[in-house]
Every structure is written in structure tokens, then in C-alpha cells.
């Protein structure tokens, strides 16, 4: 059997070697005439012809049909696999990506951003207003906070405490301990012991020293690090001591404490990437980038196989609990959603949202784009389903992920009042600056 496949391979190589030659034919008669000044160009090795590939594939198929179905893997299976590997290796050398016997489909090429409904998911830094990619968020926010020390060291140190330290429980414990220190100073300004904090104190080390930004905070509100002698101890100890100038302004200390307690981590906000498109028959077609899916590359590939299994699941009797569990798993696949709203004139308003955001966020997004933001309106999903602004439902709970097309509808009573007043609704309800940047979908 091995000899059989070697003959197939030899036949493929023979047929790909080019046209035959006569033994009596001289080299000069065969070789093309070339200019003496130009070196001969080496021709690339030709891969197997389509006929040779089809012959090899047909031979493999005939052999597979002859094998008994009930038998497990045999030595001939190993031979076939080896032949496939060798043919693929030879095809790789000759530059032919579609060698016979290859079971691996070529990787799909990523489409350019010009074909995507949106180029990707982007974020806005709340401190600088810069537009950031997902992988830039942490580094750029850290950089912005550190730069803020030159203008407002107290605010910068508070942002550093709440943003750089990811363990929220540890941050709360440390912040509460600092607040307790400041409360003691505020309540007992005459007590010198409350104005000194021992750095090597166990509570300070376990709750405060381990947090980034705490030392900068103490220094920013008026503490100074000094070495003080300790009774019955040879060497001095390091303390934070509140300066007299800071002690004379107790209201400032109280304000800084409230800032520290009420602060939140600095997070980049999702950029809506608002766009307006002309009326289009492609309004319901969405080609989304990979950023919109909370899946790895392997999981995305597996989705195609799972879709074929969905047909089988529909024929199986499932309980309500089983269906709900499957729906929950489906919702968790998506992190973001791209929503389009078709306006009365047919134009499309598009924006990016978190899949977990509430429907009210979409209403606010649309209202910001209207010339008259007081106009009452409704948003209708596919099938005419009304989405209430007051409902506390997320987009993934409404089935509006990873993309959806909705319809804008003005309140019927408002339209009647406008017509009764002898006026007609505006041709477009969007702000002029948005219409000036309208695009073709």
C-alpha cells in the first residue's frame, strides 16, 4: 500500500516537471535566447496540476470506500495520513495552498474596516477627552492621572487610590482608616498624638501602606514625613506629622476626607461613535468587528457548529428552565451592541452601547440628536414591539444584541396637535450639524 502511494506521488511530481525533451535535442535549441547583459532568471518550481491533485484525491477516496466501516484505525489509515502530510508539505514548498488530501480550511481573512458597520470599539478618557482603543485604556488613564499631579495633587492622589488599586474591599478598608485618622484630628485638634501617624504601625502597614496613592495623599493634604525618637528605643521611627498650616484649616481637611470617601475609579467611557446615514436598503445588515463579541477566536469558530446543532435542539422537548439557561448563555456572549434607529425621513442614526446598558440610554442618545429634544417619541423593535423608556431592561434582555434596527415613531397626539396648528413637521428632526456629516451606508 505504501508503494501505491509512492507511485501516486511520483506521478504527481512527473506531471509537474514540465514538457518532455528529446535526448538528441541540444541545450542551445531548447534554451530561450537571452541578452548577455541579463543573468538568467530562475523559474519558480511549479506545483502539482489540478488534474494530478484530483487524481490523488480520487485515489484516496476509492481507498476509503474499500475500508470496512466497522474497523477502527489501521496501518493504512496511518499511511493515508502520512501521504496527506507529505503532499501538504510539498504543496507548501511549491506555493500551492490547496494540496489534495488537506482537511484544514484556510483561515478567513479579516475584512478591512471599510466593510465593517463600525471600525471597532473605542473609549473616551474622562480626563483628557482622548479617544482610546480597548487595549490603551489602562495605560492612558494612568498617564493622565500622573500628569494631573502637577495641577491638583490632592485630586490626583485620590484618583490614584481608587483607580490603581483593583481590590475594592481593600481600598474601602484603607480609605475608611484614613478617614478615621482625619476625624480624630478634626474632633481633637489640641491632641498632638492624633497629628502623628506611625508609618510602621501594623494597622497602617496592612491597610494603607500597601495601597498606591496613599502616601501622595498624605503629603498633598499637609502631612510631612519625619523621623522622631521613640522612648525606650535606640533608633528613631518614621512618622507622618500634620503641619501647622494644614492644622489651621480644619475645613480643608474635612473637605479632602469627603472627596476621598465619595470618589470612584476613573474609567474610560464607551464612545458612542454617533453616525448618520442616508436611507438605505442595507439598514438591517450589520458586519461587526470582533470587539463586539465576548468570545475568543476559537469560540467564534465554534459558533458555526453550534448553529447547526440549534436545529436539533428545536426538535427536542425542553423545559422552561432549560430554555432560560440557554438564553442566559446566549446573552453573555456579547459585550457591546450596535444599534440603528430609522427616523421618519428614512435616515439612520447609529451608536455603540454596552450590551448591559438600559433602554433609557438609547432614548437619551436619540434625544440628544433631535432639533427639539422635548418631542415625545417611541422606539419600536422588530415586529412592532414598543420599548418603554421607563422599563429597567438591558439591551441583552430585550434581544437587541449584538446589533438591531429600531424605528423612531413620534407620539400620535403630538402630530395631531402640530397639524391642527396649521404647520407641518420638519423634513428632518435631526440637528443640522449631524445632517451636515451624513454618510452613505
Curated annotation (Swiss-Prot):
This is UBX domain-containing protein 6. Transmembrane segments: none annotated. Residues 27-36 have a biased composition (Basic and acidic residues). May negatively regulate the ATPase activity of VCP, an ATP-driven segregase that associates with different cofactors to control a wide variety of cellular processes. As a cofactor of VCP, it may play a role in the transport of CAV1 to lysosomes for degradation. It may also play a role in endoplasmic reticulum-associated degradation (ERAD) of misfolded proteins. Together with VCP and other cofactors, it may play a role in macroautophagy, regulating for instance the clearance of damaged lysosomes. Residues 1-10 are annotated as: Mediates interaction with LMAN1. It is found in: Cytoplasm; Cytoplasm, Cytosol; Membrane; Nucleus. The gene is UBXN6. Residues 51-63 are annotated as: VCP/p97-interacting motif (VIM). Residues 332-408 form the UBX domain. Disulfide bonds: none annotated. PANTHER family: UBX DOMAIN-CONTAINING PROTEIN 6, UBX-RELATED. Residues 12-57, 62-81, 86-113 are annotated as: Disordered. One of its GO terms (biological process) is ERAD pathway. Keywords: Cytoplasm, Cytoskeleton, Endosome, Lysosome, Membrane, Nucleus, Ubl conjugation pathway. Gene3D superfamilies: 1.20.58.2190, Phosphatidylinositol 3-kinase Catalytic Subunit, Chain A, domain 1. GO terms for cellular component: centrosome; cytoplasm; cytosol; early endosome membrane; late endosome membrane; lysosomal membrane; membrane; nucleus.
